[in-house]
Amino acid sequence: MKVLLMGHPNVGKSVIFNRLTGANVVSSNYPGTTVDYTQGYMRVFDRDIEIMDVPGTFSLDAKDKAEEVAVKMLMENPDAKIICVIDTSKLERGLYLALEIIERGFPLVLALNMWDVALDKNIVIDLQKLEVILGIPVVPTVAISGEGISTLVEKLIDVEPVDILHISNTMKLSCLMTSPGCAGCKGC
Amino acid sequence: MHLTPDERWELIEEIARRTLRFGNYKHTLKDAIGDFTVKPATGIPFAIAILFVFWSVFTSFAALMTDGFMIKIFDNHWLPWLQQNFPGGPGNWFYALMVDVGQRQGSAIVASESCFDSFGVLTSGLFLPIGVVLPAIMIFYLMLSLLEDIGYMPRLAVLIDTFLHKIGLHGYAIIPTILSLGCNVPGVEATRILETKKQRFMMMTLLAMFIPCGAQIGIMQKVIPQYIGFIMLYLFVGYFLYGFIMNKILPGKTPEILMDVPAYQKPLVKNISKKMWMRTAGFLREGVPFVMLGVLIINVLYIFGIIEFMATAMAPVFEGWFGVPRETAGPLIAALLRKDLAIAQLGAIEMTKYQMISAVVLVTIYFPCIATFVMMLKESGRAFLGSLLALMIVVFTYGGLLHLIWKLMGVA
């Protein structure tokens, strides 16, 4: 099994990678620290899982060479599972990349990293609702202290691809909720 | 199935509407510091102060460690011990290669008194990388890692953006530039964060020519501390001058950049020390053997008279065009392997201070060291030939210009 760590620049992919593999990849507080991929391994339930730390990219339309590496990595590993790392305080634009990856049919776990910073900023995210809407596991993490990393790994094992149509349909379902006379559904 | 970007954003907006709530956000001290360091009126003086502190700590720590500690170990203990105990002794070729080539005094050759002069694989070959360069790059990487982890680099990028736009780059080019001050290899690799081929080409070429690496600066700090300011200034001016020219004549785009400035973070001691150690270990692994190899090769070339032959053959160029002694041929060969080694060699050649400045500039700009060369080849492919061409032109014009300046001043 192969896992790719993807996400915007400077959201903490390399820190998560170091946490997962015990490797020593350079991580810094500026976008573009990682410009090439690094491979590592972790062992979960007696299985060797190959993990790749991928350079940050804002979308799958590459704008520079580091982003090209990221997109190429994704294309070259069609069987990979993805951990999409998002800066929790910037949920929306992180979701853009996540949706793009989902659309291409990759199974994906969403890591809402820097969860603590978002808490400090009084940003509240309804995790359960987000999970239901997206149909994928959503895990809050604080990579530098290691919070949420083990949950991330657990959820990763059984994750399945979802259909983007399913997501937009769920949205429509939960739309019905607000209209009078709706008996309720699992959509919200 | 694929959505269009608009559809995607619509969907996200809807998702966010249902799952995301923003509470009150209070302006914190962090934000205040953030503003202070990025607004030009306060940010530029602050940046200058930071760089000044960086430089002061770098030079004083390196000097303290080298002069106060390393020199004593190497010159008072290691060198005499080897001179007494190494098989062969003066006159033996293997001894000369490994320990001490000796100093000419009239017609006699006497034992060297310092690891700077002895130029053996086990003496200078160890003393230069470990005694001089190691303390310098350790302190450099400590401070670099600090600035990186706090999150200061993107702010520096914002501040210098307007300036770098004048040469067709943008603020973010400061990242490869600063990394190159440690070692050009990661600097060249970091050019990947630039958007267009033109920008990457320019950046790589400028780095390879005008940005001396930490090891080189460390040795310069030891051998020629009094000229280092002028040399750095001349190199930085070259960086902008040739950047400006290349931007004008090269085809290609130089787009604007939208930059994410991350929040300041409290640096973690663990991450800082880990990075510092990794980078230092990289130097020990790849730098030290190369310096020792360099010393060996240079000694062998001297023994067989190859360097003397080249010096004589190239004399008109060296003396006529660049205004440096013909003996600079030796250091220039060493510079292909390690620039720090080359500077150390220059220190042993008799010349005026103006010739010394010219020679150091020449060593810096004339060709990247082998490690940088390989990385440039890997990163730019065929465009590398263009880089070499630009390099040749720059060496002859900018190196010659310095000679011209000395001539106009009447000191050459």
Regions found by a protein language model. Give the residues of each.
Chain A
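Cysteine-cluster motifs in flexible loop/terminal segments that predominantly coordinate metals
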Residues: 171-188
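Conserved nucleotide-binding/hydrolysis micro-motifs of P-loop NTPases
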Residues: 32, 56-57, 88-91, 114-118, ...
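Conserved G1/Walker A P-loop phosphate-binding module
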Residues: 1-60, 77
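Canonical P-loop GTPase G-domain recognition
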Residues: 116-167
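Helical mechanochemical/support elements of P-loop NTPase systems and associated helical scaffolds
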Residues: 31, 35, 50, 62, ...
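Conserved C-terminal guanine-recognition region of P-loop GTPase G domains, centered on the G4
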Residues: 42-46, 69-138
